Amino acid sequence: MKLYFKYLFVGLFSLSFYAVNAQNVVGYCGTQSSPISDAQLDANLAYLAIHKDELKVRDVRYVPVRFIIVQTSAGKGGINVKNAFRMLCKLNDEYANQNIQFYMKDDFKYLNNDLVNTDPQSQGAGNIMKNVKDKNALNFFFTAEIKSDNPGSILGFYSPEHDIMVIKNVEATYESQTAPHELGHFFSLRHTFYGWECQPWNVGDHGKVVTFTVAPCYGAQVELVNGSNCTTAADKVCDTPPDYNFGFGWPSDCRDYNVEVYDKNNELVRPSQNNYMSYFFGCSGYHFTQGQKDVIWADLNSAKRNYLKSTYTPPATTVSNDIEYQLPTDGQEVLKTAPILLQWAPVPNATFYIVEYSRKKGFDSNVTVTEVVKTNQYTIPASYFPSGLATGYWRVTAMNEYAICNVQTNPPMSFNLVNVVSNKVLTEVKSWQINPNVVASGHLYQLNIDMNKKSDMELNIINSAGLVSHHQKLNFTNGKHSVEIKSAKLVPGTYLVVLKNDSGMESRKLIIQ
């Protein structure tokens, strides 16, 4: 049983419409008409009629977003977290000209439930999501499917009753228009063709000249080209031209809509194909009109959206995507049967990192693990890589709650998987030692080294848990050198000082008291 009357596409179209257009039906919006959304739109329009001037000055509003990844009841599947970030990046780009920006509030939530994962519009699934959602954020649920009894595929929907967004996993991308469209519904916008959802225009049923005044659905008025009824018809926004759902079934390359359709005044109807609230696919320059933007801003500032008010400001609007990888170095040998420590230098203004490790250089999704971590280290579990594999790959992307648009374009790091790590000496080094090798915490100690050849080297101090406590890059010329190191960050314990370069690696013991 559905929560409200749903846009029904079965049996309401003429056979001629399906014969011509069925091959072009790739997906549609599942947002349902409801008294709740109707009342909210009317309240927003009433507010604008009186207070529109108050909304002219619009400082940037940061809106908290919570992501809920839905998996099977067995905990399988679920969207890749990178796709959620790409979708959020898209929303920020598309809503930037409205001074509305979204940021990730708290960590990802996970919900293991088959019903929600396949039929999120069912009453049972709706009640589950209502109980799971974050009451102080705009909630996005990502599901594998959105069950429909009608032709085509539901791509996403906003539930006014539960105040949640649901996006089909495959639609969580930067390229898809689904999330900006459904977010328009969240902010009380209707389709530009409101009233034609259940029966898009076709010449057999409606004629070349549409003479009737009431649209097929919801008792909505048929909007006229001259704008005389724009405040009461269709989407009730006057700077969006009439649209009788011409986009449903239209080829998804957004070719010009060249079908001649006239309203009752014999005026040619020309829809806005690249409006976010239309049904035309594959267009460029999707946009909201100023009238739609006003409704969105009024909705965001309404009492109903008080739960979205936040004092958050981003630590930085951008985060560098240059990662200084530390361990393992590119091509380093690691034991495939032991945990593999990954470490990189902290990135300024980053509050978390996406870590990916893979069995293939191309990071194919079926052989790649993606994790979100808040530190600059991650340990791959022992024996993750199969025994016959020779090379593993990894990469890191830095982000913060708002700066989520980074895409990793640098070549990945690799490590060689071995059963026994070879003990290669440093051929450029005559001798080296740590002096003293027993030192009180906070005191200085030295690396004394005698080189027989210049070399770039790395020094790592590793604690008893196998984590890197200190990392330093060094450059030596031929001869003797001393490098002072302070132990202020080292707690008492036993450490391994590892010196390495491309030719080999050697270690010495260090004790902090």
For every predicted segment, state its role.
Residues 23-138, 142-147, 313-318:
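Propeptide-to-catalytic entry region of secreted or membrane-anchored zinc metalloproteases
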Residues 384-403:
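Beta-strand-rich modules
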Residues 340-348:
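Conserved aromatic anchor
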Residues 314-330, 413-441, 452:
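Residue-level detector of functionally pivotal "anchor" positions at catalytic/ligand-binding pockets or at interdomain
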Residues 172-286:
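The catalytic-center signature of Zn2+-dependent metalloproteases
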Residues 22, 39-40, 404-420, 492-513:
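C-terminal tail/sorting-segment detector
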Residues 126-201, 210:
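Active-site-proximal segment of zinc-dependent metalloprotease catalytic domains
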Residues 425-435, 439-513:
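C-terminal outer-membrane/trafficking sorting elements
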